[in-house]
Amino acid sequence: MKILVVGSVNMDIVARVDHMPVAGENVRGWDLRTIPGGKGANQAVAAARLGAETTLLGRVGDDEFGGRLRRGLADAGVRTGAIAARPGCPSGIALILIDAAGQNSIVITPGANGRLTPADVEAARPLIAEADAVVLQLEIPPETVAAAIGIAREVGTPTIVDAGPPRTPVDEAVFTATVLTPNEAEAAALLGLAPGSRGAEDLARDLLARGPGAVVLKAGTRGAIVADSKRLVRVPAFMIQPVDTTAAGDAFTAALAIEFVRGTDLAAAARTANAAGALACLKLGAQPSMPTAAEVADFLGRQTSSLSR
């Protein structure tokens, strides 16, 4: 199985805090770390650990972080030949605060991620054509996302699009994805709605009406909503005590993509994705928390979760 991830590569600068600061407040932090991240890189590492032959198309800076990021991806089993360094450009950086409950706030400076162009994607057309699925996110320029989706459609490769972080205005290309995987805030943003103004099921229905083949909406502790032309089903979450939720959605998306390629029923695929996301919450850091296929299988074997309508 071949997965091509087209997306961001960041260095995460992470600190723990008791609570998130409000405007004008100083808070004490501790356990400061630099950890490889970026939604694209996280999803590539997750897919590789879950057993897929995974290639990442992305850009890093010609700085110390760029070298570390590429080496870390290679060590995780990701094929890095399509990752290039942009001269004179810094690598992308994410500043992450994690509170006592394991919840996070993130500020991203895109750096070289903003230099991944439609021309770069066109040059990677052979990689798109030979992939079993292309996985994308929105931490790279919207025109680059649109180009990747368009080429994938031309060559018949399915696309799984993680709609984070949300962008305005919304590029209509995301609605042509084979599977669209937003969380609730991202779903609302895609529809031009205020966060919390619609329930998860309604958001999934409304997104499906915009054109994607299916919607798998990530609803955190309330599981996932799967919507396609035949049904709408809620897939319950697994109850855990999170340490760090930073890359749970990335683990979810990678696992979902792999199960989709295998031909697994989408609701069953979402259950496996929920398990991968839950496991990713049990360790600090993005890429270090990505589970292996064996860990997901073991976790599922110890659970009793069923589908509910």
Q: What label would you give each PLM region?
A:
Residues 1-59, 64-75, 242-243, 309:
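Glycine-rich phosphate/adenosyl-contacting loop at the front of the ribokinase-like
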Residues 3-4, 167-168, 172-173, 198-309:
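Conserved phosphate-binding/catalytic region of the ribokinase-like
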Residues 45-53, 98, 259-263:
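Alpha-helix C-terminal capping segments
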Residues 59, 82-86, 96-133, 138:
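Conserved phosphate-binding/catalytic loop of the ribokinase/pfkB sugar-kinase fold
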Residues 72-88:
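A glycine-rich helix N-cap at a beta->alpha junction
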Residues 125-129, 174-175, 209:
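A short, aliphatic-rich alpha-helical micro-motif
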Residues 133-202, 222-223:
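Conserved beta-alpha-beta core of the PfkB/ribokinase-like small-molecule kinase fold
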